[in-house]
């Protein structure tokens, strides 16, 4: 899969990411991966749901992956949850 078909969800407003997903589908992408970590996981789910229900009704969930990543910080290591949602049409 091309690197440009991956959307990393962060601190921006939810609709910015929805627009990015819709734009990728309109540019003939067959699959989009929405990735998020930690507190932004719920926003990634919102992005996928808004995209499916309001903009691209024929989009389907192809795969959902959950994982835990270990990050090294100043105070040692911490575990952070992550999600990858694959939408296709």
Swiss-Prot record:
GO terms for biological process: chromosome condensation. It comes from the Archaea. Acetylated. Acetylation at Lys-11 decreases DNA-binding affinity. The modification N6-acetyllysine is found at residue 11. Keywords: Acetylation, Chromosome, Cytoplasm, DNA condensation, DNA-binding. GO terms for molecular function: double-stranded DNA binding; RNA binding. SUPFAM superfamilies: AlbA-like. Its main location: cytoplasm. It is found in: Cytoplasm; Chromosome. One of its GO terms (cellular component) is cytoplasm. It holds the Pfam family Alba. Gene3D superfamilies: Alba-like domain. Binds double-stranded DNA tightly but without sequence specificity. Involved in DNA compaction. Belongs to the histone-like Alba family. This is DNA/RNA-binding protein Alba. It comes from Thermoplasma acidophilum (strain ATCC 25905 / DSM 1728 / JCM 9062 / NBRC 15155 / AMRC-C165).
